Every structure is written in C-alpha cells, then in structure tokens.
Regions:
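Flexible "arm" and connector segments at domain edges
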Residues: 1-98
Length: 98
C-alpha cells in the first residue's frame, strides 16, 4: 500500500476542464520520466535522477487528480471510499494488491 497522506490542491487551478487537461499533461510527464529511467540502463547517476523525477511527476499526477475532484465536488469528496471500491474491483479482477 502507498500512503500519500493529505493532498493539498491549487485553489485557483482553473475550471474542471482545465484541471482535466492538467492531469493528462502531468501523466504524460510521468510517462516521459519513466522512459528516461528505462533508457538509463547502466548509468547509475541517470537512473537515480530518473527515479527522483518519476517520484516528482507522480506527486504532480496525484495533486492534479485531487484538484480535478476538488473542483467538481469541493471539500470532503468521498475519494477514500472510492479508492476502497477501486481496490475491491481490482481484487475481483484477480489483480494482486499490496
């Protein structure tokens, strides 16, 4: 299990549509960071830098996703309950959850 703690969102982050675009942009940046990690192979310094970048970009993805939810629902969104439901769906599909 990964615990991300409380996530602060950008108050003036734009409309829900703008926030949805931001989420896609951040996800693309996370994928690009992974590509750099995948290409680094035997360069330990590059691997270390790429690992840090992946972590930073994933944090941006989480922040953007929570910002989108907040822009639509505001306040206490029930996201914790939705995460539990998502976990159950994945388990029902035979995916091993850690």
């Amino acid at each position: 299990m990964v615990n991300v703690g409380n996530v602060s969102v950008i108050r003036d982050g734009g409309s829900p549509k703008e926030r949805a675009r931001k989420l896609v942009e951040e996800a693309a940046e996370a994928f690009s960071a992974w590509e750099r990690f995948d290409r680094a192979e035997y360069d330990l310094a590059a691997i270390d830098a790429a690992e840090r970048e992946i972590m930073e970009e994933c944090a941006d993805v989480i922040t953007a996703a929570c910002g989108l939810v907040w822009s639509i629902y505001g306040g206490d969104t029930g996201l914790v309950m939705e995460m539990e439901k998502c976990k159950r769906r994945n388990e029902e599909r035979g995916r091993v959850m850690v």
